Curated annotation (Swiss-Prot):
One of its GO terms (biological process) is translation. GO terms for molecular function: ATP binding; glutaminyl-tRNA synthase (glutamine-hydrolyzing) activity. One of its GO terms (cellular component) is glutamyl-tRNA(Gln) amidotransferase complex. It comes from the Bacteria. The gene is gatA. Keywords: ATP-binding, Ligase, Nucleotide-binding, Protein biosynthesis. This is Glutamyl-tRNA(Gln) amidotransferase subunit A. Belongs to the amidase family. GatA subfamily. The keyword Nucleotide-binding applies. It catalyses: L-glutamyl-tRNA(Gln) + L-glutamine + ATP + H2O = L-glutaminyl-tRNA(Gln) + L-glutamate + ADP + phosphate + H(+). Heterotrimer of A, B and C subunits. Transmembrane segments: none annotated. The active site is at K79, S154, S178. Its EC number is 6.3.5.7.
Length: 485
């Protein structure tokens, strides 16, 4: 197996045993990007000069047996809404084209401390609004499994780069499914941690009560290793939780005999494609064969997840994105002749169609006369959705179901039909609304396109999610498929 398809765990061992140098790994990764990314289009910016310099410094430390850091010498790709000091961060928007941050996000500080090597920034839906990475101002990423298909979104670049062997790990952000859905479409592992598990300091805000940063990898153990590196409370983020237990790997190989798994009937109901249902039902049989107890339950408010999510997320976005005014930073219209024109023209020229649609929707939902009917009501529905989960978790350890109702759709197929696009979030948005952890792992393929299985856990119980996902992965995975793509 070439270096580009090696797991994080194997690379760490090879580096520790001095069988390869960090600079060899980084060189191989850039060669892979040069060869493959003109087709996949997952990267927006590369940090080649700094990456090679850092790798050479790590070579010297390796020679002295000073290999500190959980991710020593491991290459990483970062979604372009995560601030990287000195490297352009655009959120895939014309609004932030050319914006180079002068500070570091907390997750990047942590990853640098663990001696991971930043390869570059990954494509995404503009300001993380979209489910196909087609709303990016710069390019449309394709699915490595089928170049006619979307990679999912909004972290499409993060999922595609990992599946294509361009980085062994990437970070994405998940507001309503933006890590798990592209992970499902691209056949990789994607974790949305519990809200507050990972600091959001330096994540460009979309919807502050929903956003969460998480890792994408080609296997479950790698994913747990990365989450260990980025988790933890942060004084710069008042919503980060003071939870000390960040050991996700020690029990990962433990069996799941007697583990109680809930299968909500709503997750295999209307809107879920037959091929997805079949793959999930097969996965349920696999879990039973591993000793888990799977029982059907009901999460009756699932169907209200999408409407309440789109009201809440758009409302928060309309507030968060008001800072892009054409004056302090970001795109500045050259045609304006007054201050009012400058505000209007900078925003209407700098934001894309989908971002403007959501700002309109959010501003409307927050306006006087409509606030109670939309925003307040959506928050009440959010509580009902959370209560549904709380009730189920009184008797069960994890919830299982599909990640997305279908496999990846074709490029251009849904971009002009926002309601159809939003419907893809049916099974992921409730997890964000309730602030729970959720992981997507591959569980099948249909016409060559991957199908994702989602496990949802109790707050801050990522450990159990990794355990069950790891056991399932021993029975079904795509580890031999990536290299053939």
């Amino acid at each position: 197996m070439s270096i580009r398809y090696e797991s994080v765990e194997n690379l760490l061992t090879l580096i520790k045993d001095k069988k390869i140098k960090p600079s060899d790994v980084v060189k191989d990764i850039y060669d892979a990007i040069e060869e493959t990314d003109p087709t996949i289009k997952s990267f927006l910016a590369l940090d080649k000069e700094n990456a090679i310099k850092k790798a050479q410094e790590l070579d010297e430390l390796q020679a002295k047996d000073q290999m500190d850091g959980k991710l020593f010498g491991i290459p990483m790709g970062i979604k372009d809404n995560i601030i990287t000091n000195g490297l352009e961060t655009t959120c895939a928007s014309k609004m932030l084209e050319g914006f180079v941050p002068i500070y570091e996000s907390t997750v990047m500080e942590k990853l640098h401390k663990e001696n991971a090597v930043l390869i570059g920034k990954l494509n995404m839906d503009e300001f993380a609004m979209g489910g196909s990475t087609e709303t990016s101002y710069f390019k449309k990423t394709v699915n490595p499994f089928d170049h006619k298909a979307v990679p999912g979104g909004s972290s499409g670049g993060s999922a595609a780069a990992v599946a294509a062997g361009l980085v062994p790990l990437s970070l994405g952000s998940d507001t309503g499914g933006s890590i798990r859905q592209p992970a499902a479409y691209c056949g990789v592992v994607g974790m949305k941690p519990t809200y507050g598990r990972v600091s959001r300091f330096g994540l460009v805000a979309f919807a502050s009560s929903l956003d969460q940063i998480g890792p994408l990898t080609r296997n479950v153990k790698d994913n747990a290793i990365v989450l260990e590196a980025i988790s933890g409370a942060d004084v710069n983020d008042s919503t980060s939780a003071p939870v000390d237990d960040v050991d996700f790997t020690s029990e990962i190989g433990k069996d799941i005999k007697g583990l109680k798994v809930a299968l909500p009937k709503e997750y295999l109901g209307e809107g879920v494609a037959d091929d997805v249902k079949e793959a999930v039902q097969n996965a349920v049989e696999t879990l039973k064969s591993l000793g888990a107890v799977v029982e059907e339950v009901s999460l009756p408010n699932t169907k209200f997840g999408i409407p309440s999510y789109y009201v809440i997320a758009s409302s928060e976005a309309s507030s968060n994105l008001s800072r892009f005014d054409g004056i302090r930073y970001g795109y500045h219209s050259k045609e304006a002749h007054s201050l009012e024109e400058l505000y209007k023209m900078s925003r209407s020229e700098g934001f894309g169609k989908e971002v403007k649609r959501r700002i309109f929707l959010g501003t409307f939902a927050l306006s006087s006369g409509y606030y109670d009917a939309y925003y307040k009501k959506s928050q009440k529905v959010r509580t009902l959705i959370k209560n549904d989960f709380d009730k189920v978790f009184e008797n069960y350890d994890v919830v299982v179901g599909p990640t997305a109702p279908t496999t990846a759709f074709n490029l251009g197929e849904e971009i002009d039909d926002p309601l159809t696009m939003y419907a893809n979030d049916l099974l992921t948005t409730p997890v964000n609304l309730a602030g729970l952890p959720g992981i997507s792992v591959p569980c099948g393929q249909s016409n060559g396109r991957p199908i994702g299985l989602q496990f949802i856990g109790k707050p801050f119980d990522e450990k159990t999610l990794y355990r069950v996902a790891y056991q399932y992965e021993t029975q079904y995975n795509l580890h031999d498929v990536y290299e053939k793509l």
